[in-house]
Amino acid sequence: MRALFSSPAADTAGQQEALAVPLARLRFAAPLAALLGVMHTLAFAPNRWWWLQILSLAGLAALVRQAPRLRDVAWVGYAFGLGWFLSGIWWLYISMHVYGDMPAWMAAAAVLLFSAYLALHPALAAWLWQRLARGRQLSGAASALVFGAAWLVSEWLRGTEWTGFPWLNGGYAHTDGPLAGYAPLVGVYGVVAIAATLAGLLCAAAERRLHWLAGLAGVAVLAAGWPLHTIAWTQPVGKPITVRLLQGNVPQDVKFQQTGIDHSLALYTKMVTEQPAQLVVTPETAFPILLQDMPQEIALAIRTYVDTTGSSVLFGAANADSAVDYTNSAFGVGPWFKGVYRYDKHHLVPFGEFIPFGFHWFVHMMNMPLGDFRRGLPVQPPMPVAGQRVAPNICYEDLFGEEIAASLRQAERPATMLANVTNLAWFGDTIALDQHLQISRMRALESGRPMLRATNTGATAVVRPDGSVQARLPVFTLGTLQADVQGMQGLTPFVRTGNAPALGAGVLVLLAALARRRRAGAA
């Protein structure tokens, strides 16, 4: 493996010259690391190759260990990140160029720059691991633990800094694997820490640095996920309710034009009132107008439907509390409460729902209905429906499992089911739709609750509390998904504690490695 970083002549010149290999000698290692990053992306939906996530990280660990200098270590991690994110979030180009009318070169440059920023995090993880573990005679198992902790901290930083972008967190690749059993215990960050540690063990085993007991422990941790997955951390409450999830398949390029607005208003009014159900859910901004501008005949049709059938309706629309105070909201009407239920989106999308300081010029390059919205409260009451309590979240809010967990544990009466309303038409018929469904499946696993997904173009689905998909509609089709859904009560260990145990354990491992390094240096 060292040949990837140095020439044969450098090897014969001895260890000292090998450490002085210039950055140009990474010409083989960096592309290989980028290829491993692409392999990492392939582990995610629509594939179910959870094992590839571990293998690709093990390959990265092997490359990193052979890098002669710490700066080379960081470059290898960075190349891995570029391959990972360019292959995993390329669909952002579609929203900016196809629907935002941004010049192709500028949209491509924006995706490249964003991926370059995200790639700093695996570079940090690789550098931190080797900074603490290199040359300290750590056992293979101890080194693997430090790798897992470094990867955990870097992923947590990516998911929190600058409002966070935790898309493609490695833990999501394991919704169909044995490590899914750990999600109700430690959440997605705990899962990715376990996966990275297993990758470190695999790397150590390949290099014959792993004691057989440590290898056996790794196999046991992996295998234990299956029986953990069978544990019911939450319990059924009340009777199942009949839900209808609407998928209007309204083209994004006309959705906010007058013809598209008229089409959406007529379409969703018809779909909502077609037949009774205890709960009907529309996608995000299904009614692409302000609630205050809702035509009276549509409001009357929905109210009449609710009053005559006993159904409840949760629908998406924007709201204006004043001329400068807008929210992206979900509204509910039903027989189980007075007035209109309202949920305001709390975690807003940068550039889509708020514009970071200094970036108005960038937004002006796109022909999109973007602006600054006000964020909702972090904890909002669920919507009561036929003995159940439904907690909405809007668009990519379901990427933030800690926020959903906090809303459940801090609520007076926690929700018994979750509902994600979204519009991913911005990203075309791409892997983004399957990736987002996989994220919702992880939220169901973490919370022990069903997740209802009503989307404009897909993937509209019902997810069981164990993360499996109960039913779904084909993407980019017009349709209604009807299912009976059982609400769940009780709090999983992850909901009770959030990310604190996993993150705390990772920080402790890094501090222990740092203390050992300082003691060794003092000696």
From Swiss-Prot:
Segments traversing the membrane: 26-46, 49-66, 74-94, 109-129, 137-157, 185-205, 212-232, 494-514
Cellular component GO terms, alphabetical: plasma membrane
Location(s), subcellular: Cell inner membrane
CDD domains in the record: ALP_N-acyl_transferase (cd07571)
Active site: E284, K345, C395
Annotated family: Belongs to the CN hydrolase family. Apolipoprotein N-acyltransferase subfamily.
The protein's name in its UniProt record: Apolipoprotein N-acyltransferase
Organism taxonomic ancestry: Bacteria, Pseudomonadati, Pseudomonadota, Betaproteobacteria, Burkholderiales
